[in-house]
Amino acid sequence: MKKQEKLALVESALENFYGDQQFASSLRESVLYSIHAGGKRIRPFLLLEVLEALQVAIKPAHAQVAAALEMIHTGSLIHDDLPAMDDDDYRRGRLTNHKKFGEAMAILAGDALF
């Protein structure tokens, strides 16, 4: 399976997960803002690469686990950018979550990704 195919599986798993969740619209917007902010998706990609190297046939459940890795990573980035930590203004060329949605919402968004 090619890299782009693996990444597409992860993106699909992320979209499906957040499409099924019952969040307040403001929380959903904050979470998706950071999930869609870009990034290389290296952690989920590496998981799928390891599975493939072990000759495991990639299934939707594997993509869900890979997506969970990306969610945890994104949540940690949101929390890392908070004023009490690094107080960053920008991440991946965009306003950080707390600069766009406020500190309280960023904390909730980061927590929701865990």
Question: How does the language model describe each region?
Answer:
Residues 1-18:
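N-terminal amphipathic/basic leader segments beginning at the initiator methionine
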